[in-house]
From Swiss-Prot:
Function in brief: Implicated in a number of adherence functions. OPA proteins are implicated in pathogenesis and are subject to phase variation.
Coiled-coil blocks: none
Signal peptide span: 1-38
Note: Expression of opacity proteins is regulated by the number of translated repeat elements CTCTT, which code for part of the signal sequence; the protein can only be synthesized when the number of repeats place the start codon in frame with the rest of the protein.
Family recorded in the similarity comment: Belongs to the opacity porin family.
Pfam families found in the cross-reference section: Opacity (PF02462)
Protein name according to UniProt: Opacity protein opA54
TM spans (from-to): none
UniProt keyword Transferase present: no
GO molecular function: porin activity
Keywords linked to the UniProt accession: Cell outer membrane, Membrane, Signal, Transmembrane, Transmembrane beta strand
Superkingdom to which the source organism belongs: Bacteria
Amino acid sequence: MNPARKKPSLLFSSLLFSSLLFSSLLFSSLLFPSAAQAAGEGNGRGPYVQADLAYAYEHITHDYPEPTGTKKDKISTVSDYFRNIRTHSIHPRVSVGYDFGGWRIAADYARYRKWNNNKYSVNIKELLRNDNANSGGNKHLNIKTRKTEHRENGTFHAASSLGLSAVYDFDTGSRFKPYIGMRVAYGHVRHQVRSVQQETIAVTTYPQNAASSVTTNAPIRKLPHHESRSISSLGFGAVAGVGIDITPKLTLDAGYRYHNWGRLENTRFKTHEASLGVRYRF
């Protein structure tokens, strides 16, 4: 699967998500004006829970050491196989926090979609070429080649992210409350690669006055290679968005968050997320 082929579907999903988000915000602002005003007059303090549906854009970049560097023999499977992954997922997220009436702190948990990729490559190399002639003077050409087939199957899964955020809500005197904040999270990533390779030797004969013929040996299969890694790392990010008070206890939340998961072997994993959710204060 070539990640570049996903661009049309990624664009369509992004536009669809944006349309739904705008419609929800417009609907809420028109439907609940009086209740939102009452919410703005409250002190806004207390514990809360929040549920979001997030659209995540996941991006892996490789960071190769120089050939003469000290890490030249530590090229990771992630770098070799998952270089420049760009994919997306839609996933739920839950948060539990406390609102201090301006500042909020929250712990959140999310689990992402597994990404799969398959690769197939073939290489044909000429090993020998002979011009021969039989006793009758008829010439024929023999060409010996080696065909190498390589198949790879891999998965990459941001299995979980457990984060802690500190957020500040700006009081605009209306139902709309923009916010910004910082986030630190402990992320868990799993990835694996399985590859198989086989070689086939073939001799093609081209007679002078006849059709060519091919003679092949049985394929020689090399032992399959399988590697699986599980990595945990501490990363940092930022959050921003706007809350719309629906009732004194219920708030519609439209947000964005950026998170750098940190260094995974010698790659860097980052996510950009747009989310829509509801926050209920007790």
